[in-house]
Amino acid sequence: MRLVLKFGGTSLSSPNHIRNVAKIVASFSKDNEIVVVCSAVDGTTDDLLTISRLIEEKKKDDVTKALNNIIKKHKQFANQTVKNSAIRKQLIQKLNTDVSELKELVRGLTLLKEVSARSLDYLISFGERLSDDLVSFALQDIK
C-alpha cells in the first residue's frame, strides 16, 4: 500500500522527536511504499518570517543574528540526532550546502532591502528543506 506520512513542526522539535519520526517511518516502510512530508522544525518558519521582516526593516545585524540562530539549531540537531559518525558527516555536508544557499538568498534580499512574495516562499521553503535533511539522515542512521 502507498502511504503518505506528514509530520508537523512539533513532531520535529528535538533530536529525540526526529529519531522517533524516523522510527515511525521505518516501521511503516516494511510493508508499504512511503512518502514522507515534513514541516519545518518547530519555530523555524516563524524565525524565517522574522528574518523577512527584519530585512524589510533594514536591520542587517538582526538578520545575521536570526539566521545564525537557525543554522546553529539545525547543526546542533544534526549532531544530536544522528549517532553514526559517517552518516552524521554526510548530513552536515548536506546541511552546509543548503545553508550556503540560504545565506546567499538572505544576503541578496538584504542588499535589495525587500522581500517579494516569490522570494518569501523561497525563503520559507528552507525550513522544510532543512528538516527533510534531518529526517532523511536520521532514517539512514536507524537502518
Segments the model singles out, each with a brief description of its role:
Residues M1-K143:
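Nucleotide/pyrophosphate-binding catalytic subdomain
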